[in-house]
A protein has these predicted regions:
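Interfacial transmembrane-helix boundary/kink motif in multi-pass membrane proteins
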Residues: 94-109
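Membrane-embedded, hydrophobic transmembrane alpha-helices
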Residues: 1-97
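A generic short alpha-helical patch detector that favors 3-5-residue windows
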Residues: 17, 46, 50, 107, ...
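Active-site lumenal/periplasmic loops and adjacent helix-entry segments of GT-C-fold
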Residues: 116-189
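Generic alpha-helical structural element
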Residues: 10-14, 43, 47, 108, ...
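Transmembrane signal-anchor helices characteristic of membrane glycosylation enzymes that use polyprenol
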Residues: 80-84, 106-129
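Short hydrophobic/aromatic-rich motifs at helix boundaries and adjacent loops
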Residues: 26-30, 107-112, 136-141, 165-166
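Membrane-embedded helix bundles of polyisoprenyl
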Residues: 45-53, 110-115, 182-189
Length: 189
């Protein structure tokens, strides 16, 4: 139970960070029109996820890919994003957008069902050779070494994929299932 709970909390933290920083970046650039459309929320998540990858890459380059620096950097960016949204929106109620006039339970149930199906697959053992033989070991090496690792016997010795950085962050704060769940949630996009 704690295995899946830690993975779910890790993914929830990544999603919350991504959405919040994406909202702040869109507000700063003037790209929000004040409506809480699903497309705008999705765009906020993707922009914030890109910022998460940038933060992790800078920390990995500086050999600071450890729980304390990663947590401090992401916490600082989250506080700055919240403060900017508070200032620009004028309160908590306006940060999260206007309340919808009528709830959409069917859409929410479909998204929840898709998430549950993907998370069941994410908690199963990894079956793809590529994932087991290459991607997860590289992410584990990044998490263990605290930064980018040079692999001398590869064609490109310094090969840092964005996904490897996110998976190494998920491995630091979650269980072995956290990278799979992050991958499954990205498949929803």
């Amino acid at each position: 139970m704690t295995y899946s709970l830690s993975a779910a909390l890790c993914v929830l933290a990544i999603a919350g960070f991504s959405w919040l920083t994406g909202q702040a970046a869109q507000a700063k650039l003037g790209l929000q029109d004040g409506e809480s459309e699903p497309d705008a929320c999705l765009l906020s998540f993707m922009v914030g996820f890109g910022l998460l990858i940038c933060v992790l890459f800078v920390l990995a380059t500086a050999q600071l890919l450890r729980p304390l620096p990663v947590g401090a950097a992401l916490g600082l960016v989250t506080v700055i994003s919240l403060a900017y949204l508070w200032k620009s929106a004028g309160g908590w109620r306006n940060i999260f957008g206007p309340t919808p006039s009528r709830p959409r339970p069917v859409g929410m149930l479909l998204v929840l069902a898709l998430f549950l199906l993907l998370s069941l697959r994410a908690f199963a053992p990894a079956l793809e050779w590529d994932e087991l033989a290459y991607h997860l070991p590289v992410a584990r090496d990044f998490a263990r070494s605290g930064g980018l690792t040079v692999f001398e016997n590869l064609r490109y010795p310094l090969n840092a994929w964005n996904l490897h950085l996110v998976w190494s962050g998920a491995l630091m704060f979650g269980s072995e299932a956290a990278p799979h769940l992050v991958n499954a949630c990205l498949a929803v996009l």
